[in-house]
Amino acid sequence: MSGIPRSLLGQCAVALLGANARSGLTLHHAFAAYSSAAAPAQSAALIKQLRERSGAPIADVKSMLVEHGWDMDKAYEALRKKGLAAAAKKASRHAAEGLVGASFAASAASSGGSSSSEASTSGGGRGSVVVVELNSETDFVARNELFQKLLREVMGAAHALGPAAALMSARTASGPSVSEAVTALAVQVRENVRLRRAFRVDSGAGGLVFPYVHQAAAPGLGKLASVVVLAPEPDDKAQPLVLDKVVEGRLGKLLSDWCLEAQRYVLEDELTVDKLMARLKKEVGQPVRVASFLRVQCGEGLGAKAGGGDFAAEVARIVSEA
């Protein structure tokens, strides 16, 4: 600037002051409106922390921090309220994707006399199996690590409950209630997320319970889950011969379609479940029966989404409503 005459610099300064005076602004205010000087030195770190804490988009995080004077707690509360309002608007949207989770927890008697707090996504035995269905709008969200973490936490909460307890008000391992955690996830992923149903199957006295997950996206999580309880066969199981003949004749086809014992074993097509149970009887030296079973498929009964399957249109709609 050494080459610019001082007189010209003075004229520019006077002109600028005059312009600001006419507009009702001081030079200081005009400068502050276009300056980031008010942001603290650790602004990038604050944005990162609030982004991780809230899961909100970076643009929303930064705008809320600026609006609330870079106060982390106030900005988080504002983001939370904004997210809850957005989640409430999305609550009516069709959510038939998601995952079904199944996990086993051993009973106190089978875990050395102390109640087992650790649930397992594999194995089985004397104890209980919990099956939970958590729905989302898209399969993309169902593959999200946060979605799968929440599903596991809900299963853990279900194991800790009594049969008549309310699951939605139960506490998750991370602290909030199941209801609060589901809403928080919906805010983070910006989709409708809902806990649709949950089951708990106990092995019962002398029985064994086993979970199975099909089309697994992660250990214990998939699109379909089933639970089977095996129990010793009562000694007085005497079936009239005439009933056997009726089943074998007129109802044979119906049973092969609808009865578990008549279903073909998936690993050996010529082997039915009842024949498999007979094989198990020889191996253990005791008659064994299927005491009960459960089958849960993700999205079962929800039907197709209204409006057809135009994926591009659906993505455009979600983006416009986000």
From Swiss-Prot:
Instruction: Kindly report the protein's main subcellular placement as a broad class.
Output: mitochondrion
The UniProt keywords, alphabetically, are:
Elongation factor, Mitochondrion, Protein biosynthesis
Q: List GO molecular-function terms, semicolon-separated.
A: translation elongation factor activity
* PROSITE patterns for the chain: EF_TS_2
Provide the protein's localization.
Mitochondrion
InterPro entries with a match to the protein in the record: EF-Ts_dimer_sf, Transl_elong_EFTs/EF1B, Transl_elong_EFTs/EF1B_dimer, Transl_elong_Ts_CS, UBA-like_sf
GO CC terms of this entry: mitochondrion
Further remarks about this protein from its record = This protein may be expected to contain an N-terminal transit peptide but none has been predicted.
Say which family it is in. Belongs to the EF-Ts family.
Free-text function comment from the UniProt entry: Associates with the EF-Tu.GDP complex and induces the exchange of GDP to GTP. It remains bound to the aminoacyl-tRNA.EF-Tu.GTP complex up to the GTP hydrolysis stage on the ribosome.
HAMAP family (alphabetical): EF_Ts (MF_00050)
Q: What is this protein called?
A: Elongation factor Ts, mitochondrial
